[in-house]
Amino acid sequence: RLPEHKRAKYIGRVFQDPMTGTAATMQIEENLALARRRGARRTLRPGITRAERGEYRELLKILDLGLEDRLTAKVGLLSGGQRQALTLLMASLVKPRLLLLDEHTAALDPKTAAKVLDATEKIVQRDRLTTLMITHNMRDAIAHGNRLIMMYEGRIALDISGEEKKKLTVEDLLAKFGQATGSDEADDKLLLG
């Protein structure tokens, strides 16, 4: 079992707060370069190469936010949604063994949240990343991923996958949750997050 500081290089994380995953005073390309070098040996070679800039430009296109043309912009000038999308890209850049998404769209407006979820889906599928997405949005939980686990009082209450998950509706999910827990908490609070 590895200590936490050694395990960290195998895990990519995106938190709920868009401000926590990036360095605001650095440029987009500098943030990406830091993410690219995560877990690698440090060298004295100069900053960002032309090839890296080209790679970053291509990677940013998947986000569909126009950031590929703003590589030298300070991250602090980006919107919360743009920063969160950049954080997602940074967290998945070195293809972690586990990508942990902790309510990564909760602080975003619906349109930007949809773009970030779309980018998430593309990145996860393209790179075949094992991903744990924590969300209180039942629609998102049903629509994304191949397995849905619901917790109640610190324990797994539901574990749904395969064809059963594909056919699931929000109403079905809430009913199953209520049956599994004996709780009447399966209401709008769960549905809306």
What are these regions (language model features)?
Residues 1-12, 20, 24, 42-49, ...:
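ABC ATPase NBD coupling module
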Residues 26-38:
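Q-loop/switch helix immediately C-terminal to the Walker
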Residues 91-92:
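ABC ATPase C-loop
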Residues 99-102:
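Catalytic Walker B motif of ABC-type/P-loop ATPase nucleotide-binding domains
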Residues 110-112:
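Helix N-cap at the start of a conserved alpha-helix in ABC-type nucleotide-binding domains
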Residues 114-127:
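Helical segment within the ABC ATPase nucleotide-binding domain
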Residues 135-136:
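H-loop/switch region of ABC-family ATPase nucleotide-binding domains
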Residues 155-179:
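Conserved beta-strand-loop-alpha-helix hinge in the C-terminal portion
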